[in-house]
Curated annotation (Swiss-Prot):
The keyword Acetylation does not apply. Component of the cytochrome b6-f complex, which mediates electron transfer between photosystem II (PSII) and photosystem I (PSI), cyclic electron flow around PSI, and state transitions. PetL is important for photoautotrophic growth as well as for electron transfer efficiency and stability of the cytochrome b6-f complex. It is a single-pass membrane protein. The 4 large subunits of the cytochrome b6-f complex are cytochrome b6, subunit IV (17 kDa polypeptide, PetD), cytochrome f and the Rieske protein, while the 4 small subunits are PetG, PetL, PetM and PetN. The complex functions as a dimer. InterPro entries: Cyt_b6/f_cplx_su6 (IPR007802). GO terms for molecular function: electron transporter, transferring electrons within cytochrome b6/f complex of photosystem II activity. The chain crosses the membrane at residues 3-23. Keywords: Chloroplast, Electron transport, Membrane, Photosynthesis, Plastid, Thylakoid, Transmembrane, Transmembrane helix, Transport. GO terms for cellular component: chloroplast thylakoid membrane; cytochrome b6f complex. It comes from Phaeodactylum tricornutum (strain CCAP 1055/1). This is Cytochrome b6-f complex subunit 6.
Length: 31
């Protein structure tokens, strides 16, 4: 169970980082 929770948190963290970088690039292109 703990392994599944750690894997879920890792995937969520990576998704948050990639989405943040994508939003940052989009905002830079809009400027």
């Amino acid at each position: 169970m703990t392994v599944a929770i750690d894997y879920f948190l890792l995937v969520g963290f990576c998704f948050a980082v990639t989405s943040g970088l994508w939003i940052g690039l989009k905002s830079i292109k809009l400027i």
